Amino acid sequence: VKPIARSYLDKLNDKLIAANFSGNPYVMQSNGGIDTFESTKAIPLTMIESGPTSGVLGAAELGKLIKENNLITLDVGGTTAKCSLIENGNVKIITNYWIEKNRKSAGYPVMLPVVDIVEIGNGGGSIAWVDNYDKLHVGPQSAGADPGPVSYGKGGTSITTTDANLITNRINQNYFCGGEIKADMDAVSKTIAPLSKKLKFTNEETARGIIRIANNNMINALKLVSVNKGYDPRDFSLVAFGGGGGMHATSLAKELNIPKVIIPVNSSVFSAWGLSLIHISEPTRPLYISYAVFCLK
């Protein structure tokens, strides 16, 4: 990780200098603070989950402004959905975070302070597929941003959650991506047809099934940060952000009896807003002293 992170930050710094940037650049940290390029290059693991952390910190700040201290956050992007819990305005920090931990992998431990976030492989680009037993699944594979969902018209060949939302008109087909992209609905219909035929559904029924499965996966993630840790979701409000957060939030809140859903202005870039509010922070680092040297002194 270190060589890649060092190279990336060095190139970024060179570009900032070339652009006549006169400020002091900092890097978001997974513990909820920011640190210098040099410190981050020394321990790049402190950047893990730093992007989603910005969103959680932003939700906590938003909660203070609107007097909502108990929040569950839902950040739905293109590949993943991430959840966290804020109690009495406090963001939870843990030191036993595991990367890539799931039912098939033990994951990798990160023994550093990290905002407590649960992540699953379900987002707007998550691919719908049918297994050999004719069972419909959504994710964890993703179409990414390029080629992206079939509806992008960029050569995508797999139906995604975004395509399903377009078929069911949960996304306005005539104002897709703010009107910047014309949704290729002909390609969407042709691509979902084999799935529908295998399932013996209409295209719209298949699309509704994709959305229900995606929602169910997200509900499980929300339960991991709440019910599984002894919290009652009914005592919290749900803050939804990211490109797809608002698309699924009300259905999830209804399922978990969460009384209020909050969708911030410019929710698709809400994590960037949260990042702008972060303070400089550096985790305490242990000092190792040789016992023999210590005795000699």
Predicted regions and their residues:
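Nucleotide/phosphate-binding catalytic cleft detector across ATP-hydrolyzing
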Residues: V1-L71, D186-D235, G246
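A short acidic Gly-Thr/Ser loop motif
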Residues: P52, L74-T80, I120-G123, F241-G245
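Mobile "lid/hinge" segments at catalytic clefts and subdomain interfaces of large enzymes
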Residues: A81, E87, D116, G123-V188
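Single conserved hydrophobic/aromatic residue that forms the stacking wall/gate
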Residues: I278-K297
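Short glycine-aspartate micro-motif
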Residues: M47, N69-D75, I117-E119, I262
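Conserved phosphate-binding/catalytic loops in two-lobed NTP-binding clefts
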Residues: I258-W273
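Phosphate/diphosphate-binding loops
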Residues: C83, E87, T95-L136, S251-I262
